[in-house]
Amino acid sequence: MPLELVVDKTSRRVLGLQGFGPMGDGVLARINAAAGLIARGATIEDFSTLELAYAPPFSTALDALNAAANVADNLLAGRLRYVSIEDFLAWMEEPSKAPEWMALDVRHPKEVQPFLDKYGDRWLGIPYDKVRERYRELPADKQLIIICDACTRSYEVQSFLDSVGVTNTLGLGGGFNVIRRLGVDWWPR
């Protein structure tokens, strides 16, 4: 479930939360939990360290609220640079709007292949677990939009690439999980 925190950059106070998901009850539960914290002036750190009940077979120890706070922290610290879903969708509809962009898809090759077939030179596929050995193949003259399902692997790839001096990267905020739910026309069939 994609969640987005609205935060004050200076005080790091959380001002709001929005999100969506296939079943609204999960989103509603997070918004209800967040509402109480926001009313008390909670900061990013309060959300990041929030303890919520979970059952391992059904959810993760790191809740979506924690993850959203960690993303906000990484954005404010400059450790994460991203392109919005809206800007990415505009580029997919009209590539001439950002001819310097190229998608770097780090998902499994079976997921990537239809995009390589359809979009050719606008799309590059390097599996997440191969980026460390293949990063020298990346074009230096392109703004690389790193794509995965939820932006988690994109962030990790971006962090690694930063460490080796490749900084012409942006992660796709929300990842393909969000785009898949939007039902876009350009998705390969």
Walk through the language-model features, giving the residues of each.
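Flexible, glycine-rich terminal cap/loop adjacent to redox cofactors
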Residues: M1-G78
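Rhodanese-like catalytic fold shared by cysteine-dependent sulfurtransferases
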Residues: E45-P56, T60-L62, N66-W101, P109-I145, ...
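Active-site flanking residues adjacent to catalytic metal/cofactor-binding acidic residues
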Residues: L104
